[in-house]
Structures are given as structure tokens and as C-alpha cells.
Amino acid sequence: MAFGAGGGGGRRPFFRRRKTCPFSGPNAPKIDYKDVKLLSRYVSERGKIVPSRITAVSAKKQRELAQAIKRARFLGFLPYVIR
């Protein structure tokens, strides 16, 4: 008997499930420039804003998040650069 001859024991292809936006939904947190703990989760260890393809934030919420991070930096709640 030949291997792989339609025996039904083949592997299924791997599909990565699309992550949902953490800011959409009924009990999702509100993006606020004063919430430093929330904003710091979306800033890298070097101080850069993490892209939405990594954090799975929707495009609209990513724009709001970026604006809140920039506002928090301007007011001194978040640093511009982390050394």
C-alpha cells in the first residue's frame, strides 16, 4: 500500500484566525489620552506606536489610538522616546 494514496489521514492546511479589534464590542475600553496604562500597551519598548497588523486594532480605532498617544506625549503623560 502506497503512502498518501487517499487514505484520509492527510493534514489540514493551517489557517490563522483573524483577531478581533480589542476596542470593538459592548464592554470594550474607551480610548482616552489620560489612560496611560491602556496606551502604553500599544507603544513599543522604544516608544513607537505598534502597527495595527500586530495589535489587530481596526483602522478607525488605530487612528483614534494614534491621536490619543500623540496627545498624551504632548501633555507629558507618555515619553516620546524610551532609552
Curated annotation (Swiss-Prot):
Keywords: Ribonucleoprotein, Ribosomal protein, RNA-binding, rRNA-binding. It holds the Pfam family Ribosomal_S18. GO terms for molecular function: small ribosomal subunit rRNA binding; structural constituent of ribosome. GO terms for biological process: translation. InterPro entries: Ribosomal_bS18, Ribosomal_bS18_CS, Ribosomal_bS18_sf. SUPFAM superfamilies: Ribosomal protein S18 (SSF46911). GO terms for cellular component: cytosolic small ribosomal subunit. Binds as a heterodimer with protein bS6 to the central domain of the 16S rRNA, where it helps stabilize the platform of the 30S subunit. PANTHER family: 30S RIBOSOMAL PROTEIN S18, SMALL RIBOSOMAL SUBUNIT PROTEIN BS18M. Belongs to the bacterial ribosomal protein bS18 family. Part of the 30S ribosomal subunit. Forms a tight heterodimer with protein bS6. This is Small ribosomal subunit protein bS18. It comes from Methylobacterium sp. (strain 4-46). The lineage of its organism: Bacteria, Pseudomonadati, Pseudomonadota, Alphaproteobacteria, Hyphomicrobiales. The gene is rpsR.
